[in-house]
Amino acid sequence: MPDWPAGDGPRLFAYLYSYFKGLDPLLSSIAASKCPTLVFCRGIDPKLKERYDGASIRFSAEAMSVSRLLPQADIVVSHGSHQMTAQALLAGKPVLLLPTQLEQFLIMRRLVRFGAGLGIAPEVSNADYASALKALAEKGQYAAKAREFADRYAGHARSAALATMIARIEAALQPSR
């Protein structure tokens, strides 16, 4: 896992798609915030990476251990996959979701309704990433709701849930007697 870069303010972990249309303005907003930020963005344009990789932003070419990284992060920025969003919330971290597809958009709506983060819909032109990041950093209600989620599901064991699902599927596949 890479070391966090120097910077001011909360630590951001960004898990991003290289094809995200708002990637350049998002990275510009993150750079302007000077928050220490770790970014995983497979396939990012080398020129874009070079422009922002520096004092407060560090890019990783390799996938990072999210379970080890999240306890050190303060805010998560992602596109809203179910797994990434669930991991962030189970770690008690507020999230900025930037969906690129319908499923992620629906997850974003639920997250915003619950109050554990903010989202910017894909059709928003001139998205104000800076204001969203500032709100997540300065308004404690988002972190409080994320911690509420983490506390509520503290007993969640992924392996136990998977075993239960497999057992139910196997039972459903058994011929009726």
Residue ranges and their predicted role:
Residues D128-R177:
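C-terminal amphipathic helix plus adjacent low-complexity
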